[in-house]
Amino acid sequence: MVDFRNWQNNITELKANKIELPQYDVDELKHLGKKAPVWLHFGGGNLYRGFHGEIAQTLANQGDLKAGVVVCETYDDQVVSKGYQSYHNDILQVVMHENGQLDQRILAATADSVYCQRENEEGFKKVVAYFENPSL
């Protein structure tokens, strides 16, 4: 069993299980996303994980996205703490086709995740700082 939280230490096993891996420097993309964001995405639920996160991954794999996405969740702080931050903001996406075939890939183009509500002062300030960044 692969420990997804530390997937970068299990590359051989992931490849053996036909899990598609990022084709870019994950650490650099995440660093740049926090330092100089170019994409803030509001809503970290299933649509992001199944659709928008995959678009970001494809763009990063092609070299067209240099800085990772910052996900701003407004509904539930546990989406951020348990669903994103517990896994270093990475996503294991599994798509099942009608014939039963599974496409599995690690989406690692999310640089940061923030619970953004006024009552969460730390998260709110962080999102404001991202919006004030000239790169955005």
Label every model-predicted segment:
Residues 1-136:
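Non-transmembrane, aqueous-exposed alpha-helical and coiled segments at domain scale
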